[in-house]
């Protein structure tokens, strides 16, 4: 038996645009129904199945709540595996990556919290724009390469956003 579709586990149709509040609510309801405490007196097999179901729900939720992971999953569902370490043939984006990294380093060196906040706002706007672009093209077979390019960009910006959060924590201490 294969792994269940992440979307189907939450009674959702595969789509990039997902109501994250609704997803979170469904996740909490479903995970409560398979909580280990509910199976404490159940046979070992039922306990194991509940634990497996909880793990599947968690994996599905973690994937669907993250825009880059959800985008990658949608491409995979449609039969297009994206190589994990694909060479990025996107010189414009490579230049943008270098510029963003340099800017983040400068903000770190100067411990500029206001600058970090501004950088973070720009990053969120860039992420939102990529998400809009991906939503418009992911299910169009003729725009597959564009969708893959956008996923790579989304993954980079997501990683950069994590680094910004870590920098904020260090600067707040």
Curated annotation (Swiss-Prot):
GO biological-process terms attached to the record = [2Fe-2S] cluster assembly; protein complex oligomerization; protein folding
Write down the InterPro entries for this protein, in alphabetical order: DnaJ_domain (IPR001623), HscB (IPR004640), HscB_C_sf (IPR036386), HscB_oligo_C (IPR009073), J_dom_sf (IPR036869)
Q: At the top level of its lineage, which domain of life is listed?
A: Bacteria
Keyword field: Chaperone, Stress response
Q: Which Pfam families match?
A: DnaJ, HSCB_C
Xref: PANTHER family: IRON-SULFUR CLUSTER CO-CHAPERONE PROTEIN HSCB
Which family is this sequence assigned to?
A: Belongs to the HscB family.
* Known function: Co-chaperone involved in the maturation of iron-sulfur cluster-containing proteins. Seems to help targeting proteins to be folded toward HscA.
Q: How does it assemble?
A: Interacts with HscA and stimulates its ATPase activity.
- Protein name per its UniProtKB record: Co-chaperone protein HscB homolog
Organism field: Pseudomonas aeruginosa (strain LESB58)
